[in-house]
Amino acid sequence: MIGRLNLITKSNLFKNVNNLNNKNYYSTCLVIAEHDNNQLLNSTLNTITAASKLGVTNISVLVAGSKCGPVADSVSKVSGVTNVVCVDHPTLEHSLAETITPIIVKLQSSSSKEGDEITHIFTPASNFGKNFLPRVAALLNVSQISEITKVKDAETFQRPIYAGNAIATVKSTDKCKVGTVRTTAFDKAPTSGGSAKVVSANDWAVPLIEKAISETNIKWESSEVKKSERPELTSARVVVSGGRGMKNGENFKMLEELADTLGGAVGASRAAVDSGFVSNDLQVGQTGKIVAPELYIAVGISGAIQHLAGMKDSKVIVAINKDPEAPIFQVADVGLVGDLFNEVPKLTESIKKSK
């Protein structure tokens, strides 16, 4: 009798192990890809790396856009990606929250029925991700975790608070963890070595899109794109930023020349943007763009905590300011106290001569 009980126990044990393998261990992180319908943006590669820290079984990537097939193909080659879901529809060209959200919610809600449950949904903490992810979290009735900078385990994450002056460790017990990833905190996933299968979801996604369009009457009106030969601000190796000390927008040409000499991008503090010196797409900081270049040159920037929150992870920080007590010098690796209108042209000329 005892032997039989042992045999039954072993049998049940194997069944339980199989059930665990089939249910608990088949967990998926769904990464929502940021792209321009032609190319995958680096922010998605950083987000995939964050997803790889979770210990989930699968990393699936949703590519939603218009004529975005080439993007889906490139994602399938990214190391660590196991599945690619592609939804191609003209309305998705601009990733409107009203049209992309139902697709994500449907993917998550139907995943548990298929035994491969989506336990995490990650997307870059950019304007792209911030636009729709709060809707996703609300519809799934879960709390969103914003600006994830470290994945400790599948339930525990770190994120900056108080303009980056403190790091909060948060634990989520939600069935599905929904979060935006601060891309500067993670390396880019290798763009080769993967062989994921690309699956079209148009058959069930298109009706959802058309329903969303009819119910919200949403449509894209227009966009204004500024062409620049300089690298994109968030991915530039070198960033030269100016603050209120630049005095006017015309003086930013001085920084543009320095940035071009170094092959970098031009940024600005909120004070410079609010003063009308430059457009807000150049703003670096808590309410602007988060950057972490190899070299960050802050010119005429005092160093408000909101600005520091957007650039303090830069590898090398150089500050040029005439005020020796400026807070920016507290985080700078190299500081130059002097008149920027004298020092910046000298620096630019010296770099040109050294080339």
From Swiss-Prot:
A cellular component term from Gene Ontology for this protein is: mitochondrion
GO molecular-function terms, A-Z: electron transfer activity; flavin adenine dinucleotide binding
Which InterPro entries does this entry report, sorted A to Z?
DHS-like_NAD/FAD-binding_dom, ETF_a/b_N, ETF_a/FixB, ETF_alpha_N, ETF_asu_C, ETF_asu_C_CS, Rossmann-like_a/b/a_fold
Compartments reported by the entry: Mitochondrion matrix
The family database entries (Gene3D superfamilies) matched by this protein are listed as:
HUPs, TPP-binding domain
Query: Which PROSITE patterns does this chain map to?
Result: ETF_ALPHA (PS00696)
Cofactors required: FAD
Which keywords appear in this protein's UniProt record, sorted alphabetically? Electron transport, FAD, Flavoprotein, Mitochondrion, Transit peptide, Transport
The answer to keyword Zinc-finger applying to this record is no
In the record's cofactor note, how is the cofactor described as bound?
Answer: Binds 1 FAD per dimer.
Q: Which GO terms describe its biological process?
A: fatty acid beta-oxidation using acyl-CoA dehydrogenase
User: Could you give the subunit structure recorded for this chain?
Assistant: Heterodimer of an alpha and a beta subunit.
Listed name of the protein: Electron transfer flavoprotein subunit alpha, mitochondrial
| Organism expressing this protein natively | Dictyostelium discoideum
